Amino acid sequence: MAKASEHFFYVLKCSDNSYYGGYTTDVLRREAEHNAGIRCKYTKTRRPVKVIHFEKFETRSEATKAEAAFKKLSRKNKDAYLIQREEESE
């Protein structure tokens, strides 16, 4: 799915309906790692998880800034963010 030069911010929906935002260079690989319980304490106890959103960025810095901004949002604002992004992609 991704070349080494691609940078993604992604959002997972966990089995407890919580969200997890992260950074990766390969969304499918990272989703599989989360579901295998690799490299993430938060999602390890909330499996299975599913990628519900991702955005591609030119640089790692841009992607990690998007991740940090998402993580600061309240649940209500995360829901609104995801709805807005979904509407923009239609």
From Swiss-Prot:
Superkingdom classification of source: Bacteria
Ranges for domain GIY-YIG: 5-80
Pfam families recorded: GIY-YIG
Family per similarity comment: Belongs to the UPF0213 family.
Protein name: UPF0213 protein lmo0166
Species this chain originates from: Listeria monocytogenes serovar 1/2a (strain ATCC BAA-679 / EGD-e)
